[in-house]
Amino acid sequence: MTENSTSTPAAKPKRAKASKKSTDHPKYSDMIVAAIQAEKNRAGSSRQSIQKYIKSHYKVGENADSQIKLSIKRLVTTGVLKQTKGVGASGSFRLAKSDEPKRSVAFKKTKKEVKKVATPKKAAKPKKAASKAPSKKPKATPVKKAKKKPAATPKKTKKPKTVKAKPVKASKPKKTKPVKPKAKSSAKRTGKKK
C-alpha cells in the first residue's frame, strides 16, 4: 500500500506540467532518439539536424531548442547517447546501444593485430645477430652462442700440437743411430780378450 501511495502523487504533477506545455508531442528524449534513428548517419547526427527533424515531425513550442539541448545532455550523461564529435550539446551524437558491440569487436581486432606484429619483431632481432657470425644456422640463438665458443677453442689448440709433434719424431731416430756402433765395439773388445 505504501508503494502505490508514493508513486501516484509523483505522477500527477508530471502530467499536469506536460499538459500545460504541449500535449501534441512525446518526450524530448523519445523524439531525439527517433530523429537519430531516422537519419542513420554513421558519423552521428548533429543537434541542428535533430532540431529540424523534431520541428518538422512534431508540434513543438518556442522553447524547443533549449529543451532539446537539455535533453541531449541528459541522454549523454545517462549513457543512452554517445557524443562522437564536439563538446556539450554541440557536435554529433549516436545511439549507445548500436555502437557498443561494434566498438568492442574493433578493439579486440586491434589488440590481436598488435600482438601479431610485436612477435615477429622480437624474433627478427636475434636472427640478425646470429647471421653475422654463423650464416648457416639462424634459428635457435641462445643454443648457438654456447656452441660457438667451444668450437673455436679446439681449432686454436690443434695447430700448435701438430708443430710440436714433428721435431719430436725426427729427434728419436738420431739418438738411436749412435747407440748401435757402441754395442759392436764392445763385442769386438770381448772377443780380443778371449
UniProtKB/Swiss-Prot annotation:
Residues 1-29, 83-194 are annotated as: Disordered. Transmembrane segments: none annotated. The modification Citrulline is found at R42. Belongs to the histone H1/H5 family. The keyword Repeat does not apply. GO terms for biological process: chromosome condensation; negative regulation of DNA recombination; nucleosome assembly. InterPro entries: H1/H5 (IPR005819), Histone_H1/H5_H15 (IPR005818), WH-like_DNA-bd_sf (IPR036388), WH_DNA-bd_sf (IPR036390). The modification N-acetylthreonine is found at T2. The modification ADP-ribosylserine is found at S104. The gene is H1-0. Keywords: Acetylation, ADP-ribosylation, Chromosome, Citrullination, DNA-binding, Nucleus. It comes from Bos taurus. One of its GO terms (cellular component) is nucleus. The modification N-acetylmethionine is found at M1. Histones H1 are necessary for the condensation of nucleosome chains into higher-order structures. The histones H1.0 are found in cells that are in terminal stages of differentiation or that have low rates of cell division. This is Histone H1.0.
